[in-house]
């Protein structure tokens, strides 16, 4: 058997059925073996989109997503997508072609140091030097990617290794693999759990801060039981959105720079903060000196490197969130729980102050109104939102959705949180739809982010993948525009995108149905049509470019929420004639 065939067998042994990729010279043996395989390969139109799609697949399913590229520029094009997965602990297997082993280091055509390139942005990476290494390497890669704190793993595949022969009976795919030094701790220390339970039971103003680790661990049910048993309000990070139903009376919404008033004030006023599967990023804490200043902090995380990294923990617990929460609840049941009613009254008061105004009839459309109508349409189609997945891009579109859209289920709100990658949302939606074909998958994106991977319209058209793309079209890089208006004297530098393209015509040119929404009274009807069509569909929503969310200034206190300044766009664009004049003047000086 050839090495390339062994790679296919190894993928099949891991339960992989669908991969995303783009072929090239250094991966030709693999693609030749793929021809006779039952694996489904989705040909994206850019390697970055293959990585994002594999990431979206992983986030929606909880399984490892697989992306493939050739060597050199194919590998470099994967980098942004793999770095995105790494920042958000998403299990992606990235396969890259490589020049033959005897040419490595000779600057051969399309050679690049793939190991060095991927090392800082992967949980682990391998370069296979002999065909007989394939079975064990692939088993190890999937084990590492999907256990402990998940993350991407890269495998570099020299062309001669793919072409080489392997005796699969002599070198079978192992059921288990020995990984010296890799022993993720999944069960929390009993003494630490006992201490945490006592602190929670005696607390007067507890708050839970739930991060993406709750979703990764599958601990949403345990979180709900804990919150309801002790009556603890729950706020989430962006990555934790969906781990706790946001229509629950104890739900506070997202905390941080773009968080809700209820969440930010509750964290600031609490006396015990139970942080689960979160890394206390700067966007969550603001000024650390004033973050939960009166609270004892319990920090639960499977990665010991996160404990104490950004915020000091009074009771650190290293372990899998599901296991720790189960044991914590068992310990609490045996204790007398102090009454929390006074605190809950304060929480409900904060929640009343946080109710947003969303029912705007303005034109251009306010994003809040679109999100409100989207929620109503989706709840009508899927009342518990069990079969709905939202992906967002990065920028204002992400924050409007995080702030206003009430998520009810884990793995139903997919966003690039750590790296903040524009261009993530649309290809991630492709991966999510492939992973969950019966879910309604809606890609919410800004016009800037959409244009970074708009070529994937060809992919959804070619494979008939019924994703609904909703573009928040304000012809502006909205988040940068908002910051420039707030912090840079309204000097709007390079944030206006101009009038092209016509997104409806662009989609139609790829064979994708499309429509434009310019009035609030069109939103529901056109959304329903798009979602129920079960076809690839693009909606171009013309929104108010000057609309912005309140926010906490960078490095500010969570309670220092600044109202945005409404500033109309001041478009300043040099035309090509001006550019030519500048170049002509430079040429005269050189002469």
From Swiss-Prot:
Region (Thiamine pyrophosphate binding): 396-476
CDD domains: TPP_AHAS, TPP_PYR_POX_like
Enzyme Commission (EC) number: 2.2.1.6
Catalytic activity as recorded in UniProt: 2 pyruvate + H(+) = (2S)-2-acetolactate + CO2
Annotated GO biological process: isoleucine biosynthetic process; L-valine biosynthetic process; sulfur compound biosynthetic process
Any one annotated GO CC term: acetolactate synthase complex
Residue numbers binding thiamine diphosphate: 47
Cofactor list: Mg(2+); thiamine diphosphate
Glycosyltransferase recorded as keyword: no
Cross-referenced Gene3D superfamilies: 3.40.50.970, TPP-binding domain
Residues the record lists as binding Mg(2+): 447, 474
Keyword Magnesium among record annotations: yes
Keyword terms, alphabetized: Amino-acid biosynthesis, Branched-chain amino acid biosynthesis, FAD, Flavoprotein, Magnesium, Metal-binding, Thiamine pyrophosphate, Transferase
One term of GO molecular function: flavin adenine dinucleotide binding
Binding site for FAD: 149, 258-279, 301-320
A Pfam short name: TPP_enzyme_N
Cofactor note: Binds 1 Mg(2+) ion per subunit. Binds 1 thiamine pyrophosphate per subunit.
Self-association state and partner proteins as the record states: Dimer of large and small chains.
Family from the record: Belongs to the TPP enzyme family.
Protein name: Probable acetolactate synthase large subunit
Organism annotation: Methanocaldococcus jannaschii (strain ATCC 43067 / DSM 2661 / JAL-1 / JCM 10045 / NBRC 100440)
């Amino acid at each position: 058997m050839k090495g390339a065939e062994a790679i296919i067998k190894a993928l099949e042994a891991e339960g992989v059925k669908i991969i995303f990729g783009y072929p090239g010279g250094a991966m030709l043996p693999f693609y030749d073996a793929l021809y006779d395989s039952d694996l489904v390969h989705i040909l994206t139109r850019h390697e970055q989109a293959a990585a994002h799609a594999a990431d979206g697949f992983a986030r929606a399913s909880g399984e490892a997503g697989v992306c493939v590229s050739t060597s050199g520029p194919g590998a470099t094009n994967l980098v942004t997508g793999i770095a995105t997965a790494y920042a958000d602990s998403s299990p992606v297997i990235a396969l890259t072609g490589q020049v033959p082993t005897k040419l490595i280091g000779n600057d051969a055509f399309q050679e690049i140091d793939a190991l060095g390139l991927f090392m800082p942005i992967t949980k682990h990476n391998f370069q296979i030097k002999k065909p007989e290494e394939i079975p064990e390497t692939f088993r190890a890669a999937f084990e590492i990617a999907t256990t402990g704190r998940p993350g991407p793993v890269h495998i570099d595949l020299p062309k001669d290794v793919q072409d080489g022969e392997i005796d699969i009976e002599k070198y079978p795919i192992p059921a288990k693999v020995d990984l010296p030094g890799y022993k993720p701790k999944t069960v929390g220390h009993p003494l630490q759990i006992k201490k945490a339970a006592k602190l929670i039971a005696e607390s007067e103003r507890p708050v839970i801060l739930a991060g993406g680790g709750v979703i990764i661990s599958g601990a949403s049910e345990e979180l709900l039981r804990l919150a309801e048993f002790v009556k603890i309000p729950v706020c989430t990070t962006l990555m934790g959105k969906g781990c706790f139903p946001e229509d629950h009376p104890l739900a506070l919404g997202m905390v941080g720079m773009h968080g809700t008033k209820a969440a930010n004030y509750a964290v600031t006023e609490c006396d015990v903060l139970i942080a689960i599967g979160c890394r206390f990023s700067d966007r969550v804490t603001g000024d650390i000196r004033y973050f939960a200043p009166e609270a004892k902090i319990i920090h639960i995380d499977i990665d010991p490197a996160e404990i104490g990294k950004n915020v000091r923990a009074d009771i650190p617990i290293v372990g899998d969130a599901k296991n720790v929460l189960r044991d914590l609840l068992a310990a609490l049941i045996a204790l007398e729980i102090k009454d929390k009613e006074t605190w809950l009254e304060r929480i409900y008061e904060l929640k009343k102050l946080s109710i947003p105004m969303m029912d705007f009839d303005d034109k251009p459309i306010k994003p809040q109104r679109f999100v409100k109508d989207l929620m109503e349409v989706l709840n009508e189609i899927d009342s518990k939102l069990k079969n709905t997945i939202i992906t967002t891009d990065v920028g204002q579109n992400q924050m409007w959705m995080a702030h206003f859209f009430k998520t009810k289920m884990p793995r139903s709100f997919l966003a690039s949180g750590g790296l903040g990658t524009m261009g993530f949302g649309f290809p991630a939606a492709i991966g999510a739809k492939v992973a969950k074909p019966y879910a309604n998958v809606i890609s919410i994106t800004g016009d800037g982010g959409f244009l970074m991977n708009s070529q994937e319209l060809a992919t959804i058209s070619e494979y008939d993948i019924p994703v609904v793309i909703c573009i928040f079209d304000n012809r502006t890089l909205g988040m940068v525009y908002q910051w420039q208006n707030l912090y840079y004297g309204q000097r709007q530098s390079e944030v206006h995108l101009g009038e092209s393209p016509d997104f409806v015509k662009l989609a139609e040119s790829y064979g994708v149905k499309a429509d434009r929404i310019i009035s609030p009274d069109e939103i529901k009807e056109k959304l329903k049509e798009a979602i129920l069509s079960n076809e690839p569909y693009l909606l171009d929503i013309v929104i108010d470019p000057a609309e912005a969310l309140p926010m906490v200034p960078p490095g500010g206190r969570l309670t220092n929420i600044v109202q945005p300044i409404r500033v109309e766009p001041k478009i300043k664009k040099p035309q090509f004639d001006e550019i030519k004049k500048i170049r002509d003047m430079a040429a005269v000086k050189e002469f």
